[in-house]
C-alpha cells in the first residue's frame, strides 16, 4: 500500500513536467493507494491557485474551487484510493516530522505543513510514500 502526496495529484492534473512518470508510479504501486483529507484539501487549493493565476484573477473563485474539487475528487475516485484518518496520533507524528525534517528545523528536506502530515500519515499507517520532488527523498521515507 502507498500514500499519495498532494503534489502528485496536482502535477498529474496540471500535466506538469514529469507527470507521466508519476502516473506510472501510481499504476505500478503495489496494492491499495491512500490519501488523507489534508491531501485532498492541498490539491484543491493548489489547483485553484494555478487557475487563478492562469485567468489573471478574472474568473469567479468559487467556480474555480468547485471545478478543482471535482477534478481532485474524480482523480481520487479513479485511483480507488481510500482515505486515512488524521487523528491526534497523526498530529503528534507530524510535529515530530517538523522537528526532524521541517523548514523550521533547518533540515534540507524543508518539509512544510502538508508534507509533515503526509509523512506522518504514511509513517503511522506503514505505507510507502508516492511524492513529487526531492523533499521526501531526504527523509527516512525517501
UniProtKB/Swiss-Prot annotation:
Keywords attached to this entry: Hydrolase, Magnesium, Metal-binding, Nuclease, Toxin-antitoxin system
Names of the cofactor(s): Mg(2+)
Cited InterPro entries: PIN-like_dom_sf, PIN_dom, VapC_family
Pfam (any one): PIN
Residues binding Mg(2+): 5, 115
Residue ranges occupied by any PINc domain in the UniProt entry: 3-140
EC number annotated for this UniProt entry: 3.1.-.-
Top EC class of this enzyme: hydrolase
A Gene Ontology molecular function term of the record: RNA nuclease activity
UniProt function note: Toxic component of a type II toxin-antitoxin (TA) system. An RNase.
Family of this protein: Belongs to the PINc/VapC protein family.
Protein name, UniProt field: VapC ribonuclease R02377
Organism: Rhizobium meliloti (strain 1021) (Ensifer meliloti)
Source taxonomy: Bacteria, Pseudomonadati, Pseudomonadota, Alphaproteobacteria, Hyphomicrobiales
